[in-house]
Amino acid sequence: MGRLNEQRLFQPDLCDVDLVLVPQRSVFPAHKGVLAAYSQFFHSLFTQNKQLQRVELSLEALAPGGLQQILNFIYTSKLLVNAANVHEVLSAASLLQMADIAASCQELLDARSLGPPGPGTVALAQPAASCTPAAPPYYCDIKQEADTPGLPKIYAREGPDPYSVRVEDGAGTAGGTVPATIGPAQPFFKEEKEGGVEEAGGPPASLCKLEGGEELEEELGGSGTYSRREQSQIIVEVNLNNQTLHVSTGPEGKPGAGPSPATVVLGREDGLQRHSDEEEEDDEEEEEEEEEEEGGGSGREEEEEEEGGSQGEEEEEEEDGHSEQEEEEEEEEEEGPSEQDQESSEEEEGEEGEAGGKQGPRGSRSSRADPPPHSHMATRSRENARRRGTPEPEEAGRRGGKRPKPPPGVASASARGPPATDGLGAKVKLEEKQHHPCQKCPRVFNNRWYLEKHMNVTHSRMQICDQCGKRFLLESELLLHRQTDCERNIQCVTCGKAFKKLWSLHEHNKIVHGYAEKKFSCEICEKKFYTMAHVRKHMVAHTKDMPFTCETCGKSFKRSMSLKVHSLQHSGEKPFRCENCNERFQYKYQLRSHMSIHIGHKQFMCQWCGKDFNMKQYFDEHMKTHTGEKPYICEICGKSFTSRPNMKRHRRTHTGEKPYPCDVCGQRFRFSNMLKAHKEKCFRVSHTLAGDGVPAAPGLPPTQPQAHALPLLPGLPQTLPPPPHLPPPPPLFPTTASPGGRMNANN
């Protein structure tokens, strides 16, 4: 509420509604939510008109002073009531349907606890014969007026503007509920002379006396006279539940040093509202403005707030006056300088307060005499102050708290108003105070509290992470960042993979270890996946674009990862290493299969036949043999298969494709197992021809033996000569003839 009060006083542009008193032409900015929370009148008004931004109140019974005090109570939880403004506050509270404040003011009027009003105040006309009549019917029946169905309030819109509402009096004057004829203002003040005290105004016979018995009358200077020099202080403490906490009579004091008996402070009982020095100064300025407008002639008032924040006092200063005309002239002079000039002069006078307080027993509040011993209420108030731990006025002055009052002469001079040059200087000083620039950035603040908060949050207390350099406003955010992003490593229990965030581990367990259900499926092939991101990656398989090409062999791929895996075949790199035996592998699935050797068992085991597998892909294909599921169907013949590779192999029988060629003879095969068997056979024949070491014919090329090494292959001519390594046949006849031979031959 303190911040909202600052907006109301210094930043009216931030308020969302303006209260306008049409007869007086006064504007009061406020907040809808705050007004609706305290006043039933504003609650019903804003409920009916939700876009309302301007409320014009054309009510004769609503005065600016009363409305200002009501707003001060709503925003600061303190209501300052004296004999000068109690009727205005009561009227405003009754019209705005604030029953608690109206009841409290009515009780004060009935009990006559406020004393006679000051000069210029408007008092109700009372019969001169009796001084203690009952309360006027206007204040007794004000609640009935608010609830009477016969007097409805009129809400009239002004023109086509839907954001403005005018509230006027309902039926004018009604019998019994309108105040009686209010007489003219009766001035009541004293003229001090050497011979004594004489009355300068009319006789106060029509004014009510204070209750308190003969002893109280003696303190006030007798039953028939009223002296402000000898008056006592009456403090009435009332909470919002219309319960009077206690009524105490304060010590006697000098004129202007102590609060008048017409001053009563109404505050909340809990005392939880604490205000800064700036708010106290604002309240003082508002009170001074009200006194000047009402013409009370009571001078400036200072508000002194106790440590509990639940009780306050209002002090008045008496002005030297000799006649009613002179008093009016002094009031005009006081209205000349602004409230800011009075505030600056008051601060200058406060510096000389201690010196002025030592000059005499009447120089300050600390020099007041104790009340008479027969005053039981004064003793009770002092005991309550001691019980709360409130320091004495002298101790408060030593501690640098509220400064004591200056001497009467200085006070009267300041009340008349400082020179014009001092007033201009005070205005400049106040404007300088309202602008607090930041030393490190070009921002400017109207309040020092906002500047300090800006410095603490933006410049001074930025929390920086030592590892990554990120900046945080709060230390708790930095600690959370370190636990989640920088230092914390969460490992998977199954495979030991580390993660920085817990949700990454959950996703890993769902996808890799199969703890989750595949909820996302492809619209084309109805294949299911764990996440939608996997579905988008899978959609590449249905496209014909292959933008990734191998520079070595020219093979194209649809994904960049497939090209990286393929490039390992050409480079021979084995990036995956086993931590147990340091054996390296080219692919990650090979490492996973190898890890089953160290673990002692394979990760996936069939519950039907007990067969185990290293990879979940093989395990899923095996499980389809038990369930009989064959989701892959040939488009040509309609035959179904358990896996996609088997269906692709079968499709080659229809297309005649033979993608596997032999490196030795160039023959092509449809399946990889057929090529493998052919390579074994081809290698055995070629190895036998090369192991005999027979040189090739001189006229033949070196590849000639390879041409004769395949005599059994189909398609080759069968009239080839025998291999040259075979032994020659034996000769039929001997090359040399002997005599015996001849004889035999001849025989």
UniProtKB/Swiss-Prot annotation:
Keyword terms: DNA-binding, Isopeptide bond, Metal-binding, Nucleus, Repeat, Transcription, Transcription regulation, Ubl conjugation, Zinc, Zinc-finger
Gene Ontology terms: biological process: regulation of transcription by RNA polymerase II
Chain ranges of the BTB domain: 15-83
Pfam families reported in the protein's UniProt record: BTB, zf-C2H2
SMART domains noted in UniProt: BTB (SM00225), ZnF_C2H2 (SM00355)
Keyword Repressor among UniProt keywords: no
GO molecular function: DNA binding; DNA-binding transcription factor activity, RNA polymerase II-specific; zinc ion binding
Zn finger intervals (C2H2-type): 436-459, 463-485, 490-513, 520-542, 548-570, 576-598, 604-626, 632-654, 660-687
Compositionally biased spans, kind Basic and acidic residues: 267-277, 380-398
UniProt cross-link Glycyl lysine isopeptide (Lys-Gly) (interchain with G-Cter in SUMO2), position: K190
Region listing for Disordered, in residue ranges: 243-424, 694-747
Function: May be involved in transcriptional regulation.
Family named by the database record: Belongs to the krueppel C2H2-type zinc-finger protein family.
Protein name, per record: Zinc finger and BTB domain-containing protein 47
